[in-house]
Every structure is written in structure tokens, then in C-alpha cells.
Amino acid sequence: MRRAVCPGSFDPVTNGHLDIIGRASRLFDEVIVGVLINQSKTGLFTVDERIDMLREVVRSYDNVRVESFRGLLVDFCHAQQASVLIKGLRAVSDFDYELQMAQMNIGLAGVETLFMPTNPLYSFLSSSLVKDVAKWGGDISAHVPEVVRGALLARLDPPSRR
């Protein structure tokens, strides 16, 4: 079975993330979306909330599941019996960082990285940008699934809604 891991913090998941996950699901028998538990960072959403949102938005994919992990990504890959990581690239600046990580992962544990260029519609999109726009009352409906939009608006209570 060809199994891959698509890792991230997904705080929150965006349509750019979903584009990569969906495309990966057509290339692999199984895709595990790995949600990083990073206790040194405080996210807007808890890990459980992120997992719930992800499970909601990927439920139409029979071969995608969502799990959390902490520690080394390559250890998570081995625990999931996945030999490939999927990483979306928005720009050359993403590549510089991700190439270093890919080389470390292959050196540490023989885990390969498949870089997928993002759809041009999402080349500018990041979770941080979505949160900033939502915080100030901007329309994020084209950038995140509806369940995420609702959760963001409820959590942030932008000034335009007060």
C-alpha cells in the first residue's frame, strides 16, 4: 500500500491545504493528515478543534484520515508505515526551508518528500493571513471551508460584527 503523510499545524485548515490533500489522495492509496502538537506554540484553535474541522472537511475522501502527532515527523511517518511526506509549495521561499527539512528527513529515517506546487489560486494563502483578515472583519469565504469560516468568526468576533 502506498501511504503518505501530509503534515502541518492547520490552524486553521485552508482551501490551499485541502487542494494539496485532495491531489495527494489521487496519488496514494492512503493519506494521513498529521496535525502537529506543538506545546511551545499557542494556536488559535486547540489540536482537537483542528482535528474536528479537518475530519469534517476531508470526510468525502475515503482514503484520507486525520491524526495528531508530537515529536519528530519521521517517527510519526514510521508509526503510520508511511514512506512519503507531502509538502505544498507556494513560492520559492517555501522551497528553501522545505528542502532543508526534506534532506534531514531522508538522512534521519529514509522518508522521502514529494513537493507539490500549490494551485495558483492559493499561492498567497496561509493560515496566518486568513486569521488576520478574519480578525479585521474581511471576507474569508473564498479561502476556507464554511465550517472553518464559522469557527473563525465565532472565535475572533471581528470589529465589524460588534
From Swiss-Prot:
Its catalytic activity?
(R)-4'-phosphopantetheine + ATP + H(+) = 3'-dephospho-CoA + diphosphate
Give Gene Ontology CC terms: cytoplasm
Where does the record place the site Transition state stabilizer? 17
Q: State the organism of origin.
A: Salinispora tropica (strain ATCC BAA-916 / DSM 44818 / JCM 13857 / NBRC 105044 / CNB-440)
Q: What name appears for this protein in its UniProt entry?
A: Phosphopantetheine adenylyltransferase
List the PANTHER family. Answer: PHOSPHOPANTETHEINE ADENYLYLTRANSFERASE
Pathway the protein takes part in? Cofactor biosynthesis; coenzyme A biosynthesis; CoA from (R)-pantothenate: step 4/5
Output the superkingdom of the source species. Answer: Bacteria
Give the keywords, sorted: ATP-binding, Coenzyme A biosynthesis, Cytoplasm, Magnesium, Nucleotide-binding, Nucleotidyltransferase, Transferase
Record-listed substrate binding positions: 9, 41, 73, 87
Q: Where is the signal peptide?
A: none
What Enzyme Commission number does this protein have?
Answer: 2.7.7.3
Instruction: Tell me which Gene Ontology terms the entry assigns under biological process.
Output: coenzyme A biosynthetic process
What is the role of this chain?
Answer: Reversibly transfers an adenylyl group from ATP to 4'-phosphopantetheine, yielding dephospho-CoA (dPCoA) and pyrophosphate.
As cofactor, the record names:
Mg(2+)
Q: Which residues participate in ATP binding?
A: 9-10, 17, 88-90, 98, 122-128
To which protein family does this belong? Answer: Belongs to the bacterial CoaD family.
